[in-house]
Design a protein with these regions (language model features):
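C-terminal accessory helical subdomains adjacent to catalytic cores in phosphodiester-
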Residues: 3-152
Length: 152
C-alpha cells in the first residue's frame, strides 16, 4: 500500500494518472508498478503474488469510512459531526481531495492540532475497522479481495 499523494512523479504510471478518471487513476499506477517490478525481477518473479494498492490521496481518507469511529479512535468524539460533514462532500472516502491544504490529514489537523498522524491514524484504523473501510472504499475492497484469492 502506497499513497499517490506523496508519490514522486517518476514512479511508474504516476505522470499518466491525472489524465484518467478517478476510478482509473489508481488502477493505472498499480498496473504500471506491477509491470515495472516484474520487468526488474525477471522470469523467476511471480507477478500474481505482487498486489499493489495505491491510495489516491492519503491513508486518512480511508478512515472517513466511519466518521464516528474515526473521531472516537483519536479520542475526539466531539469531532464526529465535522468528520461526517467532510465525508458527505465526496462520493467515497477514497476521493477526499489531495490539495496540500485540504488533504485528509490536513482536514483532521485543522480540527485537532494535536493529531499525531502515525500513532493516531493507526488507533483510528483499529476503531474504524476493515469491514467499514471495505464497505465504503471500492479500491481498498478490491485489493483485499485480490489478496484473499492468493494461494499460500
Amino acid at each position: 500500500m502506497v499513497d499517490c499523494y506523496g508519490m514522486p512523479q517518476t514512479w511508474p504510471g504516476r505522470s499518466n494518472a491525472p489524465q484518467q478518471t478517478f476510478q482509473d487513476r489508481a488502477a493505472t499506477v498499480e498496473r504500471m508498478i506491477a509491470a515495472d517490478v516484474s520487468d526488474d525481477l525477471g522470469s523467476s518473479f511471480d507477478p500474481a503474488r505482487f498486489v499493489p494498492y495505491v491510495v489516491m490521496h492519503e491513508f486518512e481518507g480511508l478512515l472517513f469510512s466511519d466518521p464516528l469511529r474515526f473521531a472516537a479512535g483519536i479520542a475526539k468524539p466531539e469531532l464526529a459531526p465535522q468528520f461526517e460533514a467532510i465525508r458527505t462532500q465526496f462520493a467515497t472516502p477514497e476521493e477526499i481531495n489531495d490539495s496540500p491544504v485540504t488533504a485528509p490529514s490536513k482536514r483532521v489537523q485543522n480540527l485537532f492540532a494535536g493529531y499525531e498522524k502515525p500513532l493516531m491514524g493507526t488507533l483510528a484504523a483499529i476503531d474504524v475497522g476493515l469491514d467499514a473501510i471495505r464497505r465504503e472504499c471500492a479500491g481498498f475492497r478490491s485489493w483485499g479481495e485480490r489478496l484473499e484469492r492468493l494461494s499460500i
